[in-house]
Curated annotation (Swiss-Prot):
Compartments it resides in: Lateral cell membrane
A Pfam family matched in the record: Sulfate_transp
Protein name from the UniProt record: Prestin
Positions of the record's site feature: Contributes to anion binding: R399
Residue positions the entry lists as glycosylated: N163, N166
Gene that specifies this protein: Slc26a5
Record organism: Mus musculus (Mouse)
Effect of gene knockout: Homozygous knockout mice lacking Slc26a5 have no obvious developmental or behavioral abnormalities, except that, at one month, mice show small size difference compared to wild-type. Mice show loss of electromotility, shortened outer hair cells (OHCs), and a reduction of hearing sensitivity of 40-60 dB.
């Protein structure tokens, strides 16, 4: 046996011993001395806020322009190769995705390239994540497309008598204008939220909500891409039940499908599925994932151009990709009142997706991202990008994993990827004009695999949390059938309602003691745990406030089995039986327990003033129930103390304080003490502010821990028993008993 094993102490023999006083709240406060806090005046705070120092200026620049912090510290020899490989790998994936997601956004494909260039450059300056890939994202693109199609439907009549069927260019120009307006407004919203430090809004989009939402969005994207895969001409729908209408329209026109288009799409679909499995299986051995999407684009373009699929077989292709960058244009702000709901949804969803992926990769690589600065960065990318005719962007999950997985160290990898897109925009775009839309459709559908795999969340949430399962399902169903905008609003409302439900219907437990320890556990969970005679310990795992205060009081009486009203009723019934037996009607009308103190705040008995000293009535007056009446009472446990475990209560509002005061009074009326154990300083402050301690004696009901309250209760009962014994008259003592005197 080695030295470590010789010195190892078995867990069952490890002990700790503590000897200290029983800490009620007043006793503990006597042992503590509050630290003096230096409070700054408003003038000092303003002076400090507006004081300009070089360090403060530098920190502001670092915060608003993170590139000024990480670029000077760039380790060229260590980072450049990884950023180079990552940038190329991300760029070859960004090209087909930019073209494909433009189709989802209902704008010409070249605008997908613009959206893959401008925002990426801007994010490099303002973003705090080193690894995410900014640009078009399927869900956001689909939401943009929904707005564009709603305001500019396929069958719109353009002013001047040009029908949309024959005026595709005019219709697309209007849709671009709508997309620019939505993008500008969503960017302004994101920027303002970031400046106001509202980065915390992402916490309201819980993981089940986001995953249910993106899964529903994947179904929307899938149905939107079917028409391109089958090569059929159908109207594009948006709004409520759009996914149903789109599916029905494709199925009704399936007899007119283009076999050549379907064949090319399925070929690319199979290639991508098999290739991605290969990449996943051999990712440890491959220096970088095989750029399958880029190969699919090259192969599809080559086959289409070689066999002249567009002219010979009527296969829809990308079409003209004009070379060069468009000059800046002002978005149409007059559309804001028509798109503000969509802009809010796009702003929040885009930020939520971005910050979740950014935090995941940041935790993996050991750095931090700033949610507020991410909002500002996205706001700048969208608002300024809209001037250059881009549509709303976000973090692409698939590209981010590629950018990080291929060795990317900084956002210079993203800049390199955007430069590859710029090369296509300026010089080589015409090479992809023959690319079949079915190929882009297959690329999009294959990249939805990860989102469809989120259906596996359902059995997990079924096992772990029915509430989170409810959030997932309601988000999915509402987003699927109501549309992504109203579905998101519905999902957020449902998620907030579950928070209220959890606090309104928390778990209530009656605790017992693990024998010979100060450990108190749920008595229903373990056989070894036993209740302490005469004491009930009641626990709640939520705050006590207006929504659950009445439920708390009811649960206390139900779970502990100690109901003051029933106790009072039983005693009065015993009095009536006794009166009937002895034939004294006056006894039946006697008061069983008289308590002069009232602590509910409304009917409180006013304290008496005597010699300028305020005297409060006692909290609990213990009265002796005549022994001759005991036989008329139902047999049961004689509870003398109820301990409320507040270790998991983080606040109490005014309604909750009144409820607690009522509980103390109600139990006090039948001679039962109510102790509060484990109150946090916040809860004590809540009780103090709401005048719970108007009677100073109530502070004696607060204890530092459950064990302190238990010991305090036992000491109190022991002292009361000694006093009762000492007060017995001499004739009640045993005949031969000799009074003892304490030793000197």
């Amino acid at each position: 046996m080695d030295h470590a094993e010789e010195n190892e102490i078995p867990a069952e023999t490890q002990r700790y011993y503590v000897e200290r006083p029983i800490f009620s709240h007043p006793v503990l406060q006597e042992r503590l001395h509050v630290k003096d806090k230096v409070t700054e005046s408003i003038g000092d705070k303003l002076k400090q806020a507006f004081t300009c120092t070089p360090k403060k200026i530098r920190n502001i620049i670092y915060m608003f322009l993170p590139i000024t912090k990480w670029l000077p510290a760039y380790k060229f020899k260590e980072y450049v190769l990884g950023d180079l490989v990552s940038g190329i790998s991300t760029g070859v994936l960004q090209l087909p995705q930019g073209l494909a997601f433009a189709m989802l956004a209902a704008v010409p494909p070249v605008f997908g390239l613009y959206s893959s260039f401008y925002p990426v450059i801007m994010y490099c300056f303002f973003g705090t994540s080193r690894h995410i890939s900014i640009g078009p994202f399927a869900v956001i693109s689909l939401m943009i497309g929904g707005v564009a199609v709603r305001l500019v439907p396929d069958d719109i009549v353009i002013p001047g008598g040009v029908n949309a069927t024959n005026g595709t260019e005019a219709r697309d120009a209007l849709r671009v204008k709508v997309a620019m307006s939505v993008t500008l407004l969503s960017g302004i919203i994101q920027f303002c939220l970031g400046v106001c430090r509202f980065g915390f809004v992402a916490i309201y989009l819980t993981e089940p909500l986001v995953r249910g939402f993106t899964t529903a969005a994947a179904v929307h994207v899938f149905t939107s891409m079917l028409k391109y895969l089958f090569g059929v001409k159908t109207k594009r729908y948006s709004g409520i039940f759009s996914v149903v209408y789109s599916t029905v329209a494709v199925l009704q026109n399936v007899k007119n499908l283009n076999v050549c288009s379907l064949g090319v799409g399925l070929m690319v679909f199979g290639l991508l599925l098999g290739g991605k499995e290969f990449n996943e299986r051999f990712k440890e051995k491959l220096p970088a994932p095989i750029p399958l999407e880029f190969f699919a684009v090259v192969m599809g373009t080559g086959i289409s151009a070689g066999f002249n699929l567009h002219e010979s077989y009527s296969v829809d292709v990308v079409g003209t990709l004009p070379l060069g960058l468009l000059p800046p244009a002002n978005p149409d702000t007059s559309l804001f009142h028509l798109v503000y709901v969509d802009a809010i949804a796009i702003a929040i969803v885009g930020f939520s997706v971005t910050i979740s992926m950014a935090k995941t990769l940041a935790n993996k690589h050991g750095y931090q991202v700033d949610g507020n600065q991410e909002l500002i960065a996205l706001g700048i990318c969208n608002s300024i990008g809209s001037l250059f005719q881009t549509f709303s962007i976000s973090c692409s999950l698939s590209r981010s994993l590629v950018q990080e997985g291929t060795g990317g160290k900084t956002q210079l990898a993203g800049c390199l990827a955007s430069l590859m897109i710029l090369l296509v925009i300026l010089a080589t775009g015409f090479l992809f004009e023959s690319l079949p839309q079915a190929v882009l459709s297959a690329i999009v559908i294959v990249n939805l695999k990860g989102m469809f795999m989120q259906f596996s969340d359902l059995p997990f949430f079924w096992r772990t949390s029915k509430i989170e399962l409810t959030i997932w399902l309601t988000t999915f169903v509402s987003s699927l059938f109501l549309g992504l905008d109203y579905g998101l609003i519905t999902a957020v409302i449902i998620a907030l309602l579950t928070v209220i439900y959890r606090t309104q219907s928390p778990s209530y437990k009656v605790l017992g003691q693990l024998p010979d320890t100060d450990v108190y556990i749920d008595i229903d969970a373990y056989e070894e745990v036993k209740e302490i005679p005469g004491i009930k310990i009641f626990q709640i795992n939520a705050p006590i406030y207006y929504a659950n205060s009445d439920l708390y009081s009811s649960a206390l009486k139900r779970k502990t089995g100690v109901n003051p009203a029933l106790i009072m009723g039983a005693r009065r019934k015993a009095m009536r039986k006794y009166a009937k037996e002895v034939g004294n009607a006056n006894v039946a009308n006697a008061t069983v327990v008289k308590v002069d103190a009232e602590v509910d705040g409304e009917n409180a008995t006013k304290p008496e003033e005597e010699d300028d000293e305020v005297k409060f009535p006692p909290i609990v007056i213990k009265t002796t129930f005549p022994e001759e009446l005991q036989r008329f009472l139902p047999q049961g446990e004689n509870v003398h103390t109820v301990i409320l475990d507040f270790t998991q209560v983080n606040f109490v509002d005014s309604v909750g304080v009144k409820t607690l005061a009522g509980i103390v009074k109600e139990y006090g009326d039948v001679g039962i003490y109510v102790y509060l154990a484990g109150c946090s300083p916040q809860v004590v402050n809540d009780l103090t502010r709401n005048n719970f301690f108007e009677n100073p004696a109530l502070k004696e009901l607060l204890f530092h821990s459950i064990h302190d309250a238990v010991l305090g209760s036992q000491v109190r009962e022991a002292m009361a028993e000694q006093e009762a014994t000492a007060s017995l008259p001499q004739e009640d003592m045993e005949p031969n008993a000799t009074p003892t005197t304490p030793e000197a």
